[in-house]
Amino acid sequence: MAQQQQQQQHHHHLQHQQQQQQQQQLQHHSNLLLLQQQQQQQQQQQQQQQQLLQQEQQLQQYDNNLYSQNYNMEEYERRRRREREKYERQQGIQSDDRETSLFSEPRRLTEGDAEITAALGEFGDARNYINQYTVGISRHAPGGGSGNGSIGNNPRLQAPMIQQQVSSSISSSASVASSLLPPGLGQTQQQQQQQQQQQQPRPPTYLKQADNKPPYNGRGGYPGQPMKNDIPSSSGMAPPRGPPKLNSNSSSITNNAAASSSSSLLGPPISTQVPNGREKSFLGPPTTGTALHNGGGRFAQPVSNKRPGVGIQPPPPQEKDVRSMLSEMKNHFQVTPLNPIAATPQAPTRENYNLNAPNKFKYAFDIVDPIMPLLNSPPSVTPSSLITPIAPMTSPIAPLLTTPPQASQLPLGSGSGNGAAISATSLSTTTAAAAAAAAVAGVAATVAATVAPIQQLPPTPPKAMSVTPPTAKPLKIEKNPILEKQDSCLENDLELSESEDERKKDGRSPGSSSNGSESDSTESGSESSSKGEHNHHHHHQQQQQQTQQQQLHGHHPQSHHHQQFLQQQLQRQQQQQQQQQQLTANGGKKKYSQTIIASGANTITGLLTSSGGLGSSSGNNSSGGGGGSGNGGTTSSSSGGSMGGSGGSSSSGGASGGGGGGGGSGSSSGIGSGSSSNKTPSPTDSNKWNLSRFFHKPTSQTSSESVSPGNVSMKVPGILPGGAQIIPESIDVTTAIVKNEKIHHDDHLMDIDECDEDDDDVDEQHQQLRYGAGLSVTPVAVKKEEDLGLLTAAAIPKSQIKRESETQISHQRLSESATSGSSSSSCSSSDSAASASEVVPMPGPGETLQIPGVPAAITSVMRVPPINNMQKSQSMSVTVTPIAPLPASPKPRQKKPRKKKMMSVLTPPLLDSSDEDEPSTKHSSLVVAQAQAAVVPPPSTNSTTTSATTTKKGRGRPRKQQQQQSAGSGNLSSASAGSSSQAKGPTLTAAKKTLVKASASSSTSNTNSSSVLPRKREHSSQSSSNGNTPTKKMSSIPMMPAAAASAAATLLQPPAVAAANAVAASSSSSDEESSSSSCSTSKSSSSSSSSDDTETQKTNCRIVKLNKTVPVTAAMAPLAKRSSYHRRSGSSSPTSSSSETDKPNSNSHNNLGIAAISNSNSNSNNNVIVNNNLQQQAMPQQSPYKVPLSGGSQQLSSSDSSSSSSGSSSSSGDEDDAKREKNRERKPKSDKNKISTLTRIFNNKEGGAKKQGQVVIIDQSEEQLQQQQQQQQQVQIRDPLPPPSLLSQSGGVKQRMTPTQQQQLGAGLASPARTTTPLLTSLICKIDLSKLSRERILRLKKLAPSSSNQQNGHLTPNGHVVQGGSSPAGLSKVKHEHHQLHHHSQQAHSHPVKPEPELDSLYETKFRPTNVKQEFQLKQERDRDRNRERDQQQQPPPRRRKRSSSSSSSPYKEKKRKKEKTDPMLTNAKDQMLQINPMLLPSNNHERLSYDKYQLLQEDAAAAAAAAAAVAVVNSSNGQKLFQSSIGGGTGATAVGPLSIMAPSTCSEAVQTTPPTSVTGAGAPASLVSQPPPPPRLIYRSYFDREEEHPSDDLRKSKQFLQEAVQRKHAADSERDSFNQVTLYLEAVAYFLLTADAMERCSSETATWTMYKDTLSLIKFISSKFRPYQQSANCQQETHNKVAILSLRCQSLISLKLFKLRRVNCRAIINSLTDFFRNGRGDIVNGNTPSSISPSNSVGSQGSGSNTPPGKIVPQDIHNQLCKQNEYLTYVNSAHELWDQADRLVRTGNHLDFFRELDHENGPLTLHSTMHEVFRYVQAGLKTLRDAVSHPTHQSQ
């Protein structure tokens, strides 16, 4: 047992041991396995670590190499890189953004470049988005990746967003590496990697190492340096909504993490930055497959979202990302275009890439929609303080694009949202403009950086502005250079100031707030950068943001709440900025209040783009004028709307942005404005399209653009498609309108409030102004009918809104610079409110400009249709001129007008927008001139001098000055000079300067515009207060004189041009004044201008009709008084350019106290305007010196005919009228009726024009208007021409429909009750149009028919003066008759308006040309009629009566009648014109029409001169006819002399073809008719009109030719002189050709063929024989070369003839051969014998002598056919080869002139020429050559 137990124990022990051993073994084995696994893992880890280290080392080495390379580069290259880097930093451009992009761009291009941005801006955003969301390249690390902002970012660029998904500390590259590593090692390795990367010295680059302190005090300058990303709240944006940044926000941490991660795997390549700080598109050697997964590290890793690592938190589903990407792409691209355009002052939404106006629409996707989607897009990441760093990107678009890299630094929950928020923040931080752009750019940025909900933008702008306004840099993508220029950093850059085009485009800012944001801020930056730079930027941002918000609001209801929030923020910012502006400029407060008021409207989409509302609100804030933002806003941004009033002024209206308010703004910023003014010209230039593209593009405006008011909310200011301005009737709008009216007064008073208000109104009006006549029509277009017609641009055309302003608009758009600038310039100059209006960008075709205070209907003027506008412009030139100023309201004129004039002086910046060259100087001059104008008496020659002065200061000059300018320079010259000057940069000058007559027409438009605008504004002011209303009238009238001056120029020009000018004036005046009142005045003024008696005469006609109906004497006395007073003032201040302009205006337009009104006194000016209107009737005699000038100008306008007729009657009548005008001046309360009328018109309850949607502006005081309004309401309701009756009813004051319209609009602006005048629009429009056109025509006709006295007796300076003070009815009758006669003579003379009998004077405006051609033709007809009238002076009046009655009977019927008459007459007129002045026809239609107008005006003036012995007619090359009434006497004569001298210069501008000539008395007609010999006209004939030759078939004839040929050949054989020999040979060849040609008809084909073939051989022999002579260096070389060319032509034609003779055979051969080759007939042979193709038949079996290659057997007939075919086709080939050879010889030998002469004399020789033509051509050429050889001096080449 014991043993057993022992054994068992032992056994157990053994078992135990065995078990232990087994366990040990198992343990050991397991340990070994573990060890092996561990070792393997360790090895793997080591390998991976080594790989990572190697990659990092490689990347580091690569970076170091790059760095060393960079520093080893040549000094020049380094310096260039540094400069570029600095430039990019300054502009907020991320070089890495550009270079790391998927599509690398040439280094030489910088996205910041304006042109490149315009061309690629959209592309840049799209590229950024693609890089970030699709390819994974993230220039903006945080923004690039939706989840992992940091993975794909260039560490240097910005610390990539720490991968929030994985760990805050792990960089995106680390996450990528971890994803490659085993799951267990991923995080550790990532951490290690991150640590290593952080520890590793960052590759030396220009980027400042992240130290939580962005370079340049947080402004961030290095492309890769994060912009204060570590400061979460620095941006002032709401905290980011996305997951919190894992890495500390500190830029150093973010940068380090991003840098380390990117450097390890992807970072270095992605962010590889050249030492210059710019990232290289090449990221360096691929570190690993992982690094390359992204494309060799070239593209930023999509961030873990797109490629989640094993250890990294999975990103959101890719599908979702893809969908979001697609939606973002779609939204962004739509929105993104806005961002670049946001840089432009226009509505950023649509015109992001407005950097160059032409590109405005190229790259804009419906930005409004995209913005809304962005807003709608979830604000996954609200921009946090990080966003603020982005703020440095100033340019709205560029910042967004650039922001993404910075945004990538931001710890945004969602990259996309983050990027957008960042960009928005950075934008807002950068500037208000940037913020505004950021709102748009926010969308773009969202695309680039990620979808950043725009919702973030609203929060971002406030903080961003406060946090980084200075830091904000424009991004490359954006128009940063422009914004940069605002900062004055970019001023040196080529973006804005470098190129006038860009500056003009930027200058569009006056035209559109969106555009203006960058460009305006740039302007303000360069001009008043220090003063309002930040404010300006903020304002721009606010404006842009508001615009974007509005757009979003209008287009994306979903984000409406968000938009509201943004708007609130923007409003707060604007308020703050406005406060700053207030500090900066006097108008700041007003602007601010106006902004608040306009903000509501601005929110509306219409204002957004139209620059009325949004522009107005932001503009008011930013540009010291509501107009500043949208219209002035744009302008104001350009003017540095932030600058305050100055900013507003500074941009072409940026003022104008101040507009009137810009005026206020301009005036408050008057000084700053001066600076801005310099850039303003470019804005004006840009205005031409700025307005169109700003207003075309804006989505919000698009809705406003709807033809029907239904589309455009009447509560939302906007521009209807027709160009009518919608002035909301809402309380806010009313307030704005009231403010505007006040602004008119204040402008006269130079009140900041009024300036601001004016800016609001003016902004919108200014937009219209920008469109040339759009503004003018705005008031007119108020009528709802027009809203529908606006789209067609024909609805208004009717008597209602027949506004030539539309025509003008098209004119202006065509000649954007010339007409538009002129209009805006005029508006701005004439009225400070108008000047603000100038800033208001006119909507593009189909767009509506919304004026906050004006009812939508009022604004629904057809601005958009440029073509229609052009047509209307000519016929309705006057139409645009509102009648508002006409009613004599001495009280307002004296007081308010003066202030307004002062505002006008301040307004010069607005003018500046039109005149780029002399904006600030003009501005100063304007102010001084205004001051002086009051003192300076109007010298008779002033008008002449003024034209030059005006030209100099046209731009900066306020409307007053502009009026004065036009009037001052002999009206035409002043109008063309002043208007051109004003439009110097942009509108008027461009199109109209081509032909000075066009320029004069433009000038007239401008002048009218100015005149109208002052009226408008003055009328507005007047409507506000009784005294004011007359003042407004005066202002308008002074404008009218300016317009008249321009009209005078136009008179010489065809009425169409005058009409166009009037339209320009009308549109500008309309824009400047309340839209409604402006329109009326514009029309009146325009009418005057087109009449060519100068606006004064036209105004007189209208005023006389309206004012005379109302006590003409009462109105005239004050007017005359004012006129004389202003005359004195104007004269006294001739030294100052403004003063000079003023007094010339005064002189030119006696009736135009305008000159004086504009320049001399605001109050006095307004009064003078009214007085001038009356004076035109009564004053001409009173102020003969002024009258002569005025007369001359007026003659250009419609005053010509009425000038002569009223010449004698005006002497006595003028003095009385002048006295009456003076009396009226003394009766400031005489405008009570006017005020009441306006009030009623604007009161909805009263059923006035407002209810009707028509704005009737009466020239009377507001009291009078109110009294008359009741009457007018009925009349107006019936038709748009009631104002005449109202005027007659108004008692002492003459009410013009046009003035009524202005007054109504102004009244609406002045009094909230009147604010709602939507219905007034149509009424006003109708009245203005008919009145203007008829008035002008009447005057022209009157000049011819009535020698001394006419009912319409034109007051030489003042316009038509009824002889004894004829009743308005009589005057209107005369006008009607004249107009009708004019129409008949012109065949409906482009006045399709249907006048209504009640509104005779007003009804004239109804006539408007259907098109420019029609007007041109009508004018020609009128010329013929005038000639008849000269023979039979008494006949025309009856005709006129007949026509007037017919026209007044029914507008539609009359239109139809006119059309019927016009169609045949147009043809006749055309033929006549061609016959009479074929050479005078300008190159283009517009010029041609202008010339026609000029001609017609000349004829009218001549007729008038012939008719009126008392009137002295001075015809200058300008085509200006200066009529001096006998009253003028010596003074008149003196004035005439200087005027005639000045007129020629102006005239030359207007009509280049007419040499300056001055004639007086009877000589005038001859000089008028006499014109320089027309240049040779090119005659083109149809190919089928060739002469059909019927050569004799007589064989004897061919024999005769043959004998001649043989004789010459034999003579040539014996000739020794080489030249004679060659010519004889060639003659022989010509006769041989004639012989062969005759043989074709009588001989066999073979004989003919032989003859041609032999002839070809002969000529070839001759050519070869004389070829050496062609190469000789002697004097005969050229002659031999010419002979050789003739020879080659002959050879070519003979070759072609040989082919034609065999064409039938050739066709048969071709068919046979085609059949042969198609069927494959013929045997294939290897050798000589036909056989199979077997190898046996190859060389071996063939004979040794047979080396024929294998081929196909061709039958003999086929071979013969091939030979024949070759022969025939060779002829064809030779024919063309020889012909081309001859052509080359012609060019290389410089013989073009010689052969051109031959072609002109003998018809061109072509391959279709017959042999007879060849013979004639060759004989003529040889004869010329012989003559040249015989008479070398006459040798022609």
UniProtKB/Swiss-Prot annotation:
GO MF terms held by the record: DNA binding; transcription coregulator activity
Stretches with biased composition (Low complexity): 16-25, 162-179, 187-200, 247-264, 509-529, 542-552, 564-583, 815-837, 927-951, 961-1013, 1034-1049, 1056-1091, 1130-1139, 1157-1173, 1189-1212, 1267-1276, 1727-1747
Domain of life from the UniProt record: Eukaryota
Annotated Gly residues bias: 612-633, 641-673
Keyword Phosphoprotein on entry: yes
Signal peptide: none
Biased composition (Basic residues): 553-563, 892-902, 1373-1386
Modified residues (Phosphothreonine): 468
One GO CC term, this protein: super elongation complex
UniProt function note: Has a role in transcriptional regulation. Acts in parallel with the Ras/MAPK and the PI3K/PKB pathways in the control of cell identity and cellular growth. Essential for regulation of the cytoskeleton and cell growth but not for cell proliferation or growth rate. Required specifically for the microtubule-based basal transport of lipid droplets. Plays a partially redundant function downstream of Raf in cell fate specification in the developing eye. Pair-rule protein that regulates embryonic cellularization, gastrulation and segmentation.
Family (UniProt): Belongs to the AF4 family.
Stated name of the protein: AF4/FMR2 family member lilli
Chain's gene name: lilli
